[in-house]
């Protein structure tokens, strides 16, 4: 029935495609139908997710189903008369980068299990930086060799080939990680794949944007060093922007009484995070890097200055927005295979690129894993940080490509642009279906341990703070709820609420905080001497102590400090 409705709607004024944008009423009609189609598909994807999870079906993930459903609907739209709705539901990189990607990146940083992440930080950074570079160069060289042979009349420059390599080096293992969650796979493997993926996207984006600056220019030996310099500067300035805005948010929550107004507090936290993304993009830096580290900083510091309601709201709002975006993206990708009519498909090039993507992932994972294992054996002689072969194989299998690559491909220009975009889209969908659809089976084949309990359940990390467990806190919450429901202020006659929220005490309290903060800064100034005189094995422990004893006292409320140093 839906098919009949769609065909009838598309047939209406099907000959008026050239008038697209000239009739506002007709444009609004088609926009409504396009959004309706996408929302129905999104609801269907979420209901599928509910069914799969409730029935504990692990053989296939709902994201793969979402891609197939998107492909079917995209095919229906393609064969129907008219192009207006077809153009509206096609993949647009602007929508992706400005609307769909930020919630996913923010939630990734905010939900990051920091103790596991930093415990495996060396391995994660190795795969994210060196691994992405190896993948991009390997893929770029293989693609360039193919174009040099001039099959299918495809001729590419070396910069175009490397840009293609950077585009298809962005991994997106959402499907794999979701299956890992359902199987409760070992946290070490989960953390390495998760950490690599979130940093890998940022590295791939910065690498692609760096290469685009050399498009059409003559390459020299020093171009390599120039490109590396631009990459490093862009990455670390973006990181600094994200961390700075996260720290500013933590201080804002500490020195204000926003916790009295949880709805305003939650809105400000969300907007501050998005500010880091768009400010960084506006400065020609990487918004993905900024937003990722802003989310990590918010969770590490600002989280403990939030009210209990703000903790709940930010956690689940970020998670809901990310899940909606992820499902929407998979549907979007499936539809785009048929709705983007200007793409140029070259079957042999697509096949060669798919093989090259697999080869580049192999050249990334296995040599680096062996190098890391050798380093860990020589350094400490134990097997705690050892990456077994089964984990290496799973890392290789988890390297499926995602929507970031498709969005980056929109930046291609020149006569090969449509071919490169089409190839990227097909390779992404193929890897999602092949690797994502067989992940559960690979876990069984590799005999990877499952049913492992997580160190910390993410839903239990929002614990009541000591002062929130008191009867006064319940009275305060009741007072605020009554205040929200009526215009009359409600005053609670309790010493706790008077000390914390009496406006007459704000100035003295702030002066005490500022004085205490100045003393903490003085302590921090001399603490770095210990770091540079400590051994390499003690530096990680020193950084942890420095964070808990110096940085957190500056950024966290004294009442929240004990809770904030538990992680």
Curated annotation (Swiss-Prot):
Keyword vocabulary terms for this entry: Antiport, Golgi apparatus, Ion transport, Membrane, Phosphoprotein, Sodium, Sodium transport, Transmembrane, Transmembrane helix, Transport
Example of a GO cellular component annotation carried by this entry: early endosome
Where does the source fall among the domains of life?
A: Eukaryota
UniProt keyword Transmembrane present: yes
Q: List the Lumenal topological domains.
A: 1-31, 86-87, 150-159, 210-227, 299-315, 367-392, 446-567
Q: Name one GO biological process term.
A: proton transmembrane transport
Location(s) in or outside the cell: Golgi apparatus membrane
Please give the start and end residues of each transmembrane region. Answer: 32-52, 65-85, 88-108, 129-149, 160-180, 189-209, 228-248, 278-298, 316-338, 348-366, 393-413, 425-445
What membrane topology is given? Answer: Multi-pass membrane protein
Enumerate the Gene3D superfamilies for this protein.
Answer: 6.10.140.1330
The identity of this protein, by name, is Uncharacterized Na(+)/H(+) antiporter C15A10.06
């Amino acid at each position: 029935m839906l098919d009949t409705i769609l065909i009838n709607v598309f047939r209406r004024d099907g000959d008026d495609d050239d008038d697209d944008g000239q009739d506002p009423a007709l444009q609004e009609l088609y926009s409504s139908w396009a959004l309706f189609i996408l929302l129905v598909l999104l609801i269907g994807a979420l209901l599928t997710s509910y069914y799969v999870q409730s029935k504990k079906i692990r053989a296939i993930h709902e994201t793969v189903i979402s891609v197939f459903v998107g492909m079917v609907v995209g095919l229906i739209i393609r064969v129907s008369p008219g192009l207006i709705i077809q153009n509206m539901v096609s993949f647009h990189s602007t929508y992706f980068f400005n609307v769909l990607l930020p919630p996913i990146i923010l939630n990734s940083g905010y939900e990051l299990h920091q103790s596991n992440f930093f415990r495996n930080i060396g391995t994660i950074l190795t795969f994210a930086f060196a691994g992405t570079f190896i993948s991009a160069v390997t893929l770029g060289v293989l693609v360039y060799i193919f174009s040099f042979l001039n099959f299918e009349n495809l001729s590419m420059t070396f910069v175009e080939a490397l840009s293609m390599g950077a585009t298809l080096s962005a991994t997106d293992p959402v499907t794999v990680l979701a299956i890992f969650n359902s199987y409760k796979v070992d946290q070490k493997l989960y953390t390495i794949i998760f950490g690599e993926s979130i940093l890998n996207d940022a590295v791939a984006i910065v690498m692609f944007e760096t290469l685009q600056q050399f498009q059409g220019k003559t390459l020299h030996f020093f171009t390599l060093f120039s490109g590396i310099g631009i990459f490093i500067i862009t990455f670390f300035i973006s990181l600094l922007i994200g961390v700075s805005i996260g720290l500013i948010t933590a201080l804002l929550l500490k020195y204000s009484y926003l916790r009295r107004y949880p709805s305003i507090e939650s809105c400000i936290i969300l907007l501050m995070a998005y500010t880091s993304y768009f400010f960084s993009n506006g400065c020609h830096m990487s918004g993905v890097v900024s937003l990722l580290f802003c989310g990590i900083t918010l969770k590490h510091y600002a989280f403990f200055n939030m009210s209990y309601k703000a903790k709940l709201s930010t956690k689940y709002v970020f998670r809901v927005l990310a899940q909606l975006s992820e499902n929407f993206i998979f549907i979007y990708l499936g539809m785009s295979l048929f709705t983007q009519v200007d793409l140029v498909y070259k079957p042999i090039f697509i096949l060669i690129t798919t093989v090259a993507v697999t080869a580049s992932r192999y050249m990334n994972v296995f040599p680096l894993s062996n190098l890391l294992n050798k380093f860990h054996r020589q350094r400490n002689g134990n097997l705690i940080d050892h990456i077994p072969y089964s984990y290496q194989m799973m890392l290789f299998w988890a390297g499926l490509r995602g929507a970031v690559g498709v969005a980056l491909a929109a930046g291609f220009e020149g006569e090969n642009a449509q071919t490169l975009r089409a190839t990227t889209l097909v390779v992404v969908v193929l890897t999602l279906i092949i690797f994502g659809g067989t992940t559960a089976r690979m876990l069984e084949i590799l005999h990877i341990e499952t049913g492992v309990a997580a160190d910390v359940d993410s839903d239990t990390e929002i614990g009541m703070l000591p002062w929130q467990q008191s009867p006064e806190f319940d009275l305060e919450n009741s007072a605020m709820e009554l205040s929200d429901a009526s215009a009359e202020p409600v005053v609670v006659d309790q010493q706790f609420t008077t000390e914390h929220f009496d406006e007459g005490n704000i100035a003295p309290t702030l002066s005490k905080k500022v004085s205490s903060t100045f003393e903490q800064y003085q302590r921090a100034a001399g603490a770095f001497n210990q770091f540079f005189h400590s051994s390499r094995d003690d530096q990680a422990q020193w950084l942890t102590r420095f964070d808990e004893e110096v940085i957190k006292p500056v950024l966290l409320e004294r009442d929240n400090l004990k809770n904030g140093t538990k992680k």
